[in-house]
Amino acid sequence: MSDIHSLLVAAILGVVEGLTEFLPVSSTGHMIIVGHLLGFEGDTANTFEVVIQLGSILAVVVMFWRRLFGLIGIHFGRPPEHEGKGSGRLSLIHILLGMIPAVVLGLIFHDTIKSLFNPVNVMYALIVGGVLLIAAEVLKPKQPRAVGIDDMTYRQAFVIGCFQCLALWPGFSRSGATISGGMLMGVSRYAASEFSFLLAVPMMMGATVLDVYKSIGFLNMGDVPMFAVGFVMAFIVALIAIKTFLQLIKRISFIPFAIYRFIVAAAVYVVFF
């Protein structure tokens, strides 16, 4: 792969990663399709995908830095603006409760989960995840019990964490699973999305660092420019995608995202079967 071509591939995949990582549409499904069409597959490609996820994570940190620092008691000038109708406040305990179920299962079944990364499993995950999004919209309480993220209870955070376990199924979408779980538990669409983004930072950071450590043998200095381009593109596009997404869900439901997932599942079938 020539230098120019590899950088172009990196830029394209960085855009795809940034666009899809935090939307409930499955970044994995998109990455395997685009990677296959670009002829970029194998161990180096897998390592590349892991590294550029760090760019997406950095976008969340930049977007929610005040809230993230506030969780650990560090305030720069003023605490994060209160979001909700009650007097509660999102705390680090909420995040830890949301992490525990997936962390435990992920560590126990890490190798088994990695073996599930194939087009068939991803296709089915896209479909089931789409059905869950529709179910969340249909079955959610008419009046959310947690209007803002600061209204969330420990129980809601833990149950959302249990739903996050579904995202261990490649192609399911971590944001899709957590947002759906939040809505079914009476958390507003917007608050569930915000909590999903905040929960993503420690979850994705931990998983990515573990994957990078296990993939270190596939890294070489010649790949640094390609990885850097992918990282930067993922960061920039994810930043735009998160801002746009949070504005969009104030006006529309998740039904269009569910339909889009079904379309992507069909695309996986066409490309790989």
Swiss-Prot record:
It comes from the Bacteria. It is an enzyme of class 3 (hydrolase). This is Undecaprenyl-diphosphatase. One of its GO terms (molecular function) is undecaprenyl-diphosphatase activity. The keyword Cell membrane applies. It catalyses: di-trans,octa-cis-undecaprenyl diphosphate + H2O = di-trans,octa-cis-undecaprenyl phosphate + phosphate + H(+). It comes from Klebsiella pneumoniae (strain 342). It is found in: Cell inner membrane. Catalyzes the dephosphorylation of undecaprenyl diphosphate (UPP). Confers resistance to bacitracin. Keywords: Antibiotic resistance, Cell inner membrane, Cell membrane, Cell shape, Cell wall biogenesis/degradation, Hydrolase, Membrane, Peptidoglycan synthesis, Transmembrane, Transmembrane helix. Its EC number is 3.6.1.27. It is a multi-pass membrane protein. Bacitracin is thought to be involved in the inhibition of peptidoglycan synthesis by sequestering undecaprenyl diphosphate, thereby reducing the pool of lipid carrier available. The keyword Cell inner membrane applies.
